[in-house]
Amino acid sequence: MAGPPGDDIFRATLAAVAPGTPFRDGLERILRGHTGALIVLGHDKVVEGLCTGGFELDVEFSATRLRELAKMDGAIVLSSDLARIVRAAVHLVPDPTVPTEESGTRHRTAERVAKQTGFPVISVSQSMHIIALYVAGRRYVLDGAAAILSRANQALATLERYKLRLDEVAGTLSALEIEDLVTVRDAISVSQRLEMVRRIADEIESYVVELGTDGRLLSLQLEELMAGVETERELTVRDYLPVGSRAGNAAQVLAELSAMSPTDLLDLTVIARVIGFSGGADILDRQISPRGYRMLAKVPRLPRMVVDRLVDHFSTLQKLLAAGVDDLQAVDGVGETRARAVREGLSRLAESSILERYV
C-alpha cells in the first residue's frame, strides 16, 4: 500500500544515496577525506535564486569530481537525476524566516534550502563525521551498510516470529469457519496480526531501499515471508465486513487500519469498530459467519471473478460448503468441471483445517 507523497520522495532519495551508487561513493570519499559538504540534489529557478557566487560547471557527475569540489568552500548543486554537477562553490542564501531546529550553519542552511525548494539537500559534517539528509520536511542521518543491515536482520527475525503466529491464528480461524463457530474476536485477531506483519514488512522495505545493492538477499527473504499476506489481508476484511453502509468498501477499511496508531492496534475492540462492528462490551464474543472469500481463494485455478459470483450467489461459507455440484453449476461461469473442482477443493480444505486444529 502506497504511503503519503512525502514518503515516496523520501524513499526515492534513499535509493539514490544507497550504498553501491556513484553518489554514495562520492559522499563516502568526502567523509574519508575529513571535509564537509553541502549538496543540493536538484536545480531549477528557485534554487538558482538562492545561489550567489561560485561558478557554473554543467559537467557529468563522478564520485571523484564531487570529492574534489567538496574541498572548496560553498555548496554544490546537482541536476535532479544526479547525472550532472551544475554549480560549485556556491553561497546559498535561503529565506532566514524559514524555521529550522538545527544549530550549525551548514545544517541550518541545508534544512532551509530543502524546505524552500522542495529538493533534497545533503549536509556532510566534518566534525561529527555524519551524512545528514534533509527531504520532505524531515532530517535523516545516513548510516553505514553494516549498521543498517544489523537493524534489518533484527526486524526480519521479528517478522518471522510474527508471521509464524499469524499462520497459527489464521489456521485456527479456518477451522472455526468450517465449524461455523467464528466470533468477532477470532476474525479481528487475524486482521490485527496481518496489519502488524504488514507494518514490520514496511520497515524492512525501507532498509532494503537504503541498503541498495547490499539489500538483495534481504529483499528475497522479505518477498518469501510476505507472499500472499496482502491478499489475505484484503480477503479477511471482505469476509467479515458487516452488511450496511460500509459493505463492499474494503479498501477504505484497510486504509483506516493502516492509519491506526500502534496503541489502538493492540485493542481488538477498536479494530472491530474500525471494520464496522458496533455494540457494547460483548462485541468481541458475538458469533459471525464468513462470506467465503478466504476459503475460495485457496481453491486452485479459481478466477477472482468466479469467486465474487459464488459469494454473491451463496452469501455465506456454510451455504457454499453445503452446496452440491448442481447447486454450484447454477452460478454464471461455473460449468460441471469447475463445479467439481470447487466442491472437491472445499472438501479438502475443510478436512485439512479440522485435522490441523485437532491432530
UniProtKB/Swiss-Prot annotation:
Looking up PROSITE patterns in the UniProt record yields: DAC
Tell me what reaction this enzyme catalyses: 2 ATP = 3',3'-c-di-AMP + 2 diphosphate
Q: Which residues form the DAC domain?
A: 7-145
Domain of life, per the record? Bacteria
Q: Enumerate the GO terms in the molecular function aspect.
A: adenylate cyclase activity; ATP binding; diadenylate cyclase activity; DNA binding
This protein's cofactor list reads: Mg(2+)
User: Which GO BP terms apply?
Assistant: DNA repair
For this UniProt record, give its keywords in alphabetical order, as a comma-separated list: ATP-binding, DNA damage, DNA repair, DNA-binding, Magnesium, Nucleotide-binding, Nucleotidyltransferase, Transferase
**Residues noted as binding ATP in the record, renumbered to the chain:** G74, L92, T105, R106, H107, R108, T109
* Enzyme Commission designation: 2.7.7.85
Q: Does the record carry DNA-binding as a key word?
A: yes
Query: Is DNA-binding a UniProt keyword of this protein?
Result: yes
PANTHER family xref list: DIADENYLATE CYCLASE (PTHR34185), DNA INTEGRITY SCANNING PROTEIN DISA (PTHR34185:SF3)
Which NCBIfam families does this one have? PRK13482.1
Summary of subunit composition and partner proteins: Homooctamer.
Q: What does this protein do?
A: Participates in a DNA-damage check-point that is active prior to asymmetric division when DNA is damaged. DisA forms globular foci that rapidly scan along the chromosomes during sporulation, searching for lesions. When a lesion is present, DisA pauses at the lesion site. This triggers a cellular response that culminates in a temporary block in sporulation initiation. Also has diadenylate cyclase activity, catalyzing the condensation of 2 ATP molecules into cyclic di-AMP (c-di-AMP). c-di-AMP acts as a signaling molecule that couples DNA integrity with progression of sporulation. The rise in c-di-AMP level generated by DisA while scanning the chromosome, operates as a positive signal that advances sporulation; upon encountering a lesion, the DisA focus arrests at the damaged site and halts c-di-AMP synthesis.
Family designation: Belongs to the DisA family.
Spell out the protein name for this chain: DNA integrity scanning protein DisA
* Species, as recorded: Parafrankia sp. (strain EAN1pec)
